[in-house]
């Protein structure tokens, strides 16, 4: 009887603690003034990467912005290290003249193409084993494959199996979390400027 009562008491404390934290966060945000409108817009920023989310492309594959079409994770949205299918909404113009050794390859990805990408930065906090959390200011991906049109085969006549561990670009800009190592994305880690 005493153990059942103790477990119910601990559950009640954890629920009450979470409620108090949410309420204090609500009071702090309202007392500081509304920066970008309502509290709901701030809460929306911390959700999964789902269909319709605009992501920044942080490699040099000529894509600037990609809109998520589908998460290959399943019903839930994508998190750090997950693979998504996206449509390129904005792309860099193709560089015609060669200026030294530029970071931008000649037009691998164009606007309107459907690409596969690995989520390398997410605005939603992700807990780590040591108790800390990693959270980024933006949602970003690295392009790892370009979806071919239906019926398009490679030179051998058989359909090519898509490899999701080789990035299309040759550089990755900005920080990348070390959780990519657990997702077997070692090539992205080796190309990254900073590992967090």
From Swiss-Prot:
Mostly expressed in pistils and inflorescences, including floral organs and meristems, and, to a lower extent, in leaves. Its main location: mitochondrion. Induction: By brassinosteroid (BR), repressed by the BR biosynthesis inhibitor brassinazole (BRZ). The keyword DNA-binding does not apply. One of its GO terms (biological process) is integument development. One of its GO terms (cellular component) is ribonucleoprotein complex. CDD domains: Ribosomal_uL14 (cd00337). The keyword Nucleotide-binding does not apply. SMART domains: Ribosomal_L14. InterPro entries: Ribosomal_uL14 (IPR000218), Ribosomal_uL14_CS (IPR019972), Ribosomal_uL14_sf (IPR036853). Disruption phenotype: Female-sterility due to abnormal gynoecium and ovule growth and development with highly reduced integuments and collapsed cells in the distal regions of the ovule primordia. Slight reduction in the rate of growth and size of the pistil. Residues 148-175 are annotated as: Disordered. Binds to 23S rRNA in mitochondrion. Required for the formation of the proximal region of the ovule primordium during floral organogenesis, thus participating in patterning and growth of ovule. Also regulates the initiation and/or maintenance of integument and embryo sac ontogenesis. Prevents inappropriate cell death in the young ovule. HAMAP family: Ribosomal_uL14 (MF_01367). Part of the mitochondrial 50S ribosomal subunit. Belongs to the universal ribosomal protein uL14 family. This is Large ribosomal subunit protein uL14my. It comes from Arabidopsis thaliana.
């Amino acid at each position: 009887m005493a153990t059942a009562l103790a477990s119910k008491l601990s559950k009640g404390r954890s629920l009450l603690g979470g409620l108090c934290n949410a309420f204090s966060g609500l009071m702090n945000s309202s007392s500081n003034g509304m920066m970008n409108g309502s509290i709901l817009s701030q809460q929306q920023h911390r959700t999964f990467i789902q269909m319709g989310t605009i992501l920044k492309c942080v490699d040099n594959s000529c894509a600037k912005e990609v809109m998520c079409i589908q998460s290959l994770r399943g019903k839930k949205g994508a998190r750090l290290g997950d693979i998504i299918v996206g449509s390129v909404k904005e792309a860099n113009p193709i560089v015609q003249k060669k200026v030294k050794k530029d970071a931008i390859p000649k037009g691998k990805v164009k606007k309107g193409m459907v690409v596969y990408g690995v989520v390398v930065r997410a605005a939603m906090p992700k807990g780590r084993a040591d108790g800390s959390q990693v959270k980024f200011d933006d949602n970003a991906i690295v392009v790892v494959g370009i979806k071919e049109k239906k019926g398009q085969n490679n030179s051998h006549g058989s359909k090519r199996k898509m490899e999701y561990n080789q990035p299309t670009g040759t550089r990755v800009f900005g920080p990348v979390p070390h959780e990519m190592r657990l997702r077997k994305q070692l090539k992205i880690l080796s190309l990254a400027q900073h590992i967090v």
